[in-house]
Amino acid sequence: MNIYLLRHGQTEENRKGSYYGNLDIGLNEIGVIQGNKAKKFFNDIKLDRVYVSDKIRTLEMAKLALGLKEMEIIQDSRINETNFGDFEGKTYEEIKMFYPKECLCWTDNWKEFVPPQGESYIELCKRVKSFMDDIKRLDVHNILICAHSGVIRAIYRSEEH
């Protein structure tokens, strides 16, 4: 089985340097260009399945990467980006200013720290592992997973164990 990992293209929140895992933000102009570049890569690959998170930016990216290929795109919330809770939509500098104690805890223990109303990196990894365990049971050749940088790191982490 071949698993292709594709991160969504640029968004305005990316450009601003914000944490925005749970915000449903679409691609910006550069993100659309990046999606069209991905289409060239996937043009000659026969994909059996395509998975995206439930965020619009991954759906937009997958559609651009598929080009004219007609196929079902499966949304799965287990591959959503980390929920940064109250940190959503804020830059690191803003988080340091508005949440100084929490920011220090996050810096000291980033894997286990849970932002207010959010989730930890460990919780993200558990979600992603559950998703990947299901993927490994499939009898298919080529899968595209269009997701987020944190999710892609968690996929690599799950494959190490």
Describe these PLM feature segments.
Residues E12-E13, L59, E70, K129-E160:
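Active-site-adjacent alpha-helix immediately C-terminal to a catalytic or transition-state-stabilizing loop
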Residues R15-S18, E102-F113:
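Short, basic/glycine-rich phosphate-binding loops at helix/coil junctions
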Residues G35, K39, Y99, C103, ...:
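Short amphipathic alpha-helical/adjacent loop interface patches that line ligand
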